[in-house]
Amino acid sequence: MARPLEEALDVIVSTFHKYSGNEGDKFKLNKTELKELLTRELPSFLGRRTDEAAFQKLMNNLDSNRDNEVDFQEYCVFLSCIAMMCNEFFEGCPDKEPRKK
């Protein structure tokens, strides 16, 4: 039986490959594929409307090697940044119950 972290890693990898290569390199997300992934898998991140300028800025920030696509490493950096932002948010929240030692 897979542990929760193993399952999370599987979801990260399988989600990338679900969208990558529909229109080209099967190991990269082009702009259309990335937008579809974010719209379907992270809808609260994009909000209800997609601001094209904001999306293009995100794409440019993720595309560290400037090939106009997002590879798996760039995708993981993006998810890591989101995870760190979530962690910082929850660090500021008071604990409801004291932590067990």
Curated annotation (Swiss-Prot):
Q: Where in the cell is it found?
A: Secreted; Nucleus; Cytoplasm
Q: Could you name the domain of life of the organism this protein comes from?
A: Eukaryota
Q: Does the keyword Cytoplasm apply?
A: yes
Q: Which residues carry this modification: N-acetylalanine?
A: A2
Q: Which GO terms describe its cellular component?
A: cytosol; extracellular space; nucleoplasm; nucleus; perinuclear region of cytoplasm
The positions annotated for binding Ca(2+) 2 are D63, N65, D67, E69, E74
Post-translational modification N6-acetyllysine, affected residues:
K35
Q: Which GO terms describe its molecular function?
A: actin binding; calcium ion binding; calcium-dependent protein binding; chemoattractant activity; identical protein binding; protein-containing complex binding; RAGE receptor binding; transition metal ion binding
**Primary localisation category:** secreted
In this chain the EF-hand domain maps to: 12-47, 50-85
Instruction: Report keywords, A-Z.
Output: Acetylation, Calcium, Cytoplasm, Metal-binding, Nucleus, Repeat, Secreted
InterPro entries, alphabetized? EF-hand-dom_pair, EF_Hand_1_Ca_BS, EF_hand_dom, S-100_dom, S100/CaBP7/8-like_CS, S100_Ca-bd_sub
| Residues that, per the record, bind Ca(2+) 1 | K28, E33
Gene induction: By nerve growth factor.
- Tell me a GO biological process for this protein: positive regulation of canonical NF-kappaB signal transduction
The UniProt subunit note reads as follows: Homodimer. Interacts with PPFIBP1 in a calcium-dependent mode. Interacts with PGLYRP1; this complex acts as a chemoattractant that promotes lymphocyte movement. Interacts with MYH9; this interaction increases cell motility. Interacts with Annexin 2/ANXA2. Interacts with TP53; this interaction promotes TP53 degradation. Interacts with CCR5 and CXCR3. Interacts with FCGR3A; this interaction inhibits PKC-dependent phosphorylation of FCGR3A.
The task this protein performs is described as: Calcium-binding protein that plays a role in various cellular processes including motility, angiogenesis, cell differentiation, apoptosis, and autophagy. Increases cell motility and invasiveness by interacting with non-muscle myosin heavy chain (NMMHC) IIA/MYH9. Mechanistically, promotes filament depolymerization and increases the amount of soluble myosin-IIA, resulting in the formation of stable protrusions facilitating chemotaxis. Also modulates the pro-apoptotic function of TP53 by binding to its C-terminal transactivation domain within the nucleus and reducing its protein levels.
Could you tell me what this protein is called?
Answer: Protein S100-A4
Query: Species name for this entry?
Result: Rattus norvegicus (Rat)
